[in-house]
Amino acid sequence: MGLFSMFKKESNEKPDISEIAYDYDGYDIAFESGKTEPKLYSEINNIVTNNNFDINNISEYKNLNINSDYDTFLTFYDSWLEELKNNNYVIHLDNYTNITDFANKINQLLDRINSKKKIDVDLITNEYKEELKKYSFMGNDIEENFNYDVLEANIVAQELRKIGYELINFFIGYDNNDKTIIKIDDIEKLKEIETKIK
């Protein structure tokens, strides 16, 4: 059950953050030595960057094509992710990220991949504030372990779908809190690549 379906339920109790489903996609792209072809990461890179960033410029990717072991992959993955973040293709989202800043960075990312579409930052900010009130039942303080980032990501994901994009993050055995977007039309292609990696 998604975030906004849950809020339609009649209840006199404060919603529990643990009940909120992640309303965005995650992809497990962890390398398997002897099985995973490095070129698959080039295909992922092209989807994420809309062919605007050449992964072959990363020396660690060249090394992965020569020495395909897990340690080499981790070195490549860290460098690749850093390059994507430095070039505004990936956004870090954690509990300290402001919703307005996150939404603005999403629009910068849309610019980066040559999209003419935008999400409404003011609408998202106001919607987030309204949803947040539902976790402060009868004026009580929000619990210390509240996952603000999950709520932010879910709201932004809903708005992105309206303009044809999906919010995603990658897993390599753990969630690194780094998000990016892809065209909804590319979801099946990315899922197919994921099955080839594993």
Model-inferred region functions:
Residues 2-198:
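Contiguous interface-forming segments/domains that mediate binding rather than catalysis
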